Amino acid sequence: SLRHRWLDDFFIVLTQLGYRAPMTLWGVLVTLALLLQRNTYAATLWVGTLLLGQTLLVGLKQWIAWPRPNLVAMPPESWAFPSGHTTMGLVFLGTLTILCLPGVPGRRQKAILSAVCILATTIAAARLYLTVHWPTDILGGLLLGGMILACLHTLVLQRPFRTVRPWPLIAATLAAWVISLFTWVVPHYGDIVHRYLPLSLS
């Protein structure tokens, strides 16, 4: 089996941070960080892109209605295609990157882009590792997220935003992850692990 305890723990924690409550907290804290910089346009871009991503994601899931693989004790209840974690993980990270990069020195931009790509790929891989998605769901999520980011990039090229100070946004992101970890993951970890047990072990 490809399942190992330390990988289970890593991917389960990562995937739990991609559910609605943690992502909502992340979105709210970054919005506040942008508003505290009095950068209303950048805040509007942030919120608008996230809402567009969520709307398209839910619409496609309901329209395609593709069932998930039935390989774990308690598969998520939503439809499989496209992967919501993959889509919104890419949209959140990509939008944050588009907003932050102009305020980052050039020599650090490649490092940030590499880190974002690795994290987005790892989020997608977590859903495959936990066997709650088909590979096509992940591909669909990457394509949908990429299309949304391409639209945002085009808009920003036509109507640039005032440079954002990146560190408050990064701090807001880290705060959201830590709060979410100790609010929605750690206290319920035993039950969460049970959901992802392979059927042969549940």
Residue ranges of predicted features:
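Membrane-embedded catalytic cores of phosphoryl/pyrophosphoryl-handling enzymes
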Residues: 70-197
